[in-house]
Amino acid sequence: ALGKSGKEPVLVLRDIKTENYLGGSLAIARHLSDFCKEVSVLSFLGEKDTHKSFIERNIEENICLNFLTKSNSPTILKRRFVDNVDKKKILGVYSINDDLITNEEEDLFIESFDRLSKEHDLVIISDYGHGLITPRVAKHISKSEIFISLNAQINAANIGTHSIRKYED
């Protein structure tokens, strides 16, 4: 951080270094790929700014990507500004549309989930509260016959609005 601007009451930052990495469900898949023979990912990319080529270049060979398209959305991109001295996050800027997916997108997700879950021993659901897992999708997942491991996260974009309660026993 450089400090406060002399002209306006705003924080001024300087980008010294840039790092790009795969986060969210792709980070989980990459960790799992170290000790699992095969890992599948089912998620959404935005119809705008997909970043698909970056993802494909940086994903392990034993990870099978199954992407659906979320309409009127970018692929989620989180920029974080980190202080160069103490490595603490100063600011985050998210490119995101966390509106719920459409009914048609729900249908595609459920169809893909049913197909893929039959091919695997374990399903890990990472619900970041960004509109991809609707109450209808959560109810469908909850009724699955396969063992489900669930991670419902609270983050800066969903505090107070996201809960694990939408999943049934």
What are these regions (language model features)?
Residues 1-2, 7, 15-169:
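Ribokinase/PfkB-type carbohydrate-kinase core domain
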